Amino acid sequence: MENAKWLRWMVVFLGIAGISYLLYMNLNRPEVAMEPEDEKMLADKNGLVGDGIADDTAALQAAINEVPPGGTLKLPDGIYKVSRNPDLKAVTGYGESHFALEITNPLTIEMDEVTIKTETDGRYGIFWIHDTADVHLKGGSLIGDKFPRDAELTSNIAVLLHETQNSTIENTYTKNHSQGIHLHDADNNLIRNVTSEYNYGSGIINFSSNNNIIDSCVVRNSSDGHLSLYGVGENNTVVNCVVTEDRPDHTIEQGITVESEKNSRIENNTVSGFYYGIDIKNGAESNIITSNNVFDNEYNIAIRPGDGGENLLTPSHDIVITNNFATNPRGNSHFGIFVDIGEGHVITGNTVNKGNLIITDPKMFAKYEKQNSYVD
């Protein structure tokens, strides 16, 4: 009798344990994301052509809109022509911009072997990513059909990250836009392995945005500060980038600009071919410029008031310039490191040519002259 009672309780106990386990596994089962191949089928369903001739704007937008939040859209290989959508107008503190496509939900777009092209004279960009987070663009070439000679700085932006957080743009190529990548009031984002060239304005610009990382990017043959931190952003990092200008008739361009920026870091970049290589100006404060290789610029590294005109000429303070190679400025220039304004700067551990450390404040020059290295 006792054995039978014991067996009944054991059966009840095992049943409860089994049900509890099943409930636990069901409640804690991870979400199953759609496979990229499923997303490819979704894209095909929307009638993507990808021959570079047909207008794929509506089909691309439909495919983007059908991706569930957090899902992945893998675009089939091809060349996608897009046109200006009159309903997509971004208004920022930098100006107005029109676009072909918009993204307003978290998603990933994989664009291996994909080219999206615009007609430059239409004055529009490609992706307007706004009021969202966790958007990831991977791969792809975003190309205007010709250099935008009659553009404005915001008329043809390849990708605008606008009030968007925690997003990434990786392994993407842009060419022939007014700006390549523009971050505007966009925080905690990553721009990595992006190449942007032949822009009317900046290849990459971080405007009034914080805590962003620009890593291992190439910006070439653009303008207006090829890679620009501007508009009172804070705690941004530019690292491992190559910024260069090699057009013989472009001698007044700026490389990396740090303008009205605070507590940001410019590290281990290579900058060459500019009038101002690394250009700190207009109220920049407490930024670190370290371990960069800056050469063949009229001014390799400069702390100066600004460009004049409509720009502010506010002094910059507490800039740390340390452990940089700022040798061989172009032509007969002797401006390896040029410090013309501000207080509280730290200038140590740099290598320049003899006579190429120019600090206009005599006391500051006397303090730091022997804390740097000189080569012939």
What are these regions (language model features)?
Residues M1-F13:
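N-terminal Sec-pathway targeting helices
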Residues A43-P76:
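Acidic Gly/Asp/Thr-rich repetitive segments characteristic of extracellular carbohydrate-active
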Residues L60-P69, K81-E110, I116-K138, D145-N166, ...:
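Extracellular beta-strand-rich solenoid/capping regions of secreted or surface-exposed proteins
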Residues K74, K81, E102, E110, ...:
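Extracellular beta-strand solenoid repeats
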Residues S333-D376:
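Leucine-rich solenoid repeat scaffolds
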Residues G140, S167, T172, N189, ...:
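Consensus "Asn ladder" position of solenoid repeat domains
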Residues L27-E39:
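Ser/Thr/Pro/Gly-rich low-complexity linker/stalk segments immediately outside membranes or between
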Residues G71, R84-N85, T118-Y124, K146-E152, ...:
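Short glycine/acidic-rich loop motifs that flank beta-strands on beta-rich extracellular proteins
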